[in-house]
């Protein structure tokens, strides 16, 4: 509680609002932090680590202030990682949430999680925070090489990459 109270106090004291802030639903006091951000007009990117987190987001009452639901998979076994991503995605899909659903893997399961996400029609994210390795197992020289591999993965599926040309969302409540 003390940590979330400090976070809320920091949010209330912001001089300049960020476009969005990522809040992990597995952290204590996440609801208070999300509500404080939304009151300030800051979009929330909800970091989901478990099926319970996905359910909590759906029932939280903060979805109108969410720009994105980030399905974060840290499971180390490929089949289990993909299964967990699918279970979390199913909770969000059934609830027909409006925020973008983005999948994000970790370590050796990153590329399996991303491939699965693309098959589901979801957005993906990759960088050195997630993995140091390319899909073929070789060491990446940097973020650009990881992103390049993800772009090729997207193009192989015949999908478009939206980003800078996408219309920006206004702040929550506007």
Tell me the role of every PLM-derived stretch:
Residues 9-10, 22-129, 138-145:
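Catalytic alpha/beta core domains of metabolic enzymes, predominantly
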Residues 2-6, 77, 133, 170:
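Flexible glycine/acidic-rich beta-alpha junction loops that bind and position SAM and/or redox cofactors
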Residues 134-159:
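C-terminal helical cap(s) of enzyme catalytic domains, especially alpha/beta-barrels
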Residues 159-166:
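Flexible, glycine/charged-enriched surface loops at secondary-structure junctions
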Residues 1-23:
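Glycine/small-residue-rich loop that forms an oxyanion/phosphate-binding "nest" at active or ligand-binding sites
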């Amino acid at each position: 509680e003390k940590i979330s109270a400090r976070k809320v106090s920091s949010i209330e004291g912001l001089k300049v609002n960020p476009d969005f802030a990522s809040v992990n639903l597995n952290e204590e006091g996440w609801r208070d932090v999300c509500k404080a951000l939304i009151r300030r007009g800051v979009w929330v990117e909800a970091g989901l680590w478990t099926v319970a987190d996905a359910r909590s987001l759906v029932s939280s009452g903060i979805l109108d202030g969410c720009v994105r639901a980030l399905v974060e998979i840290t499971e180390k076994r490929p089949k289990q990682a993909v299964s967990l991503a699918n279970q979390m995605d199913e909770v969000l899909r059934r609830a027909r949430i409006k925020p973008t659903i983005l999948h994000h893997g970790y370590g050796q399961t990153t590329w399996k999680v991303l491939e699965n996400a693309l098959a589901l029609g979801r957005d993906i994210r990759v960088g050195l925070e997630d993995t140091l390795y390319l899909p073929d197992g070789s060491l990446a020289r940097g973020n650009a090489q990881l992103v390049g591999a993800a772009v090729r993965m997207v193009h192989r599926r015949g999908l478009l990459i939206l980003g800078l040309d996408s219309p920006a969302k206004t702040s929550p409540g506007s």
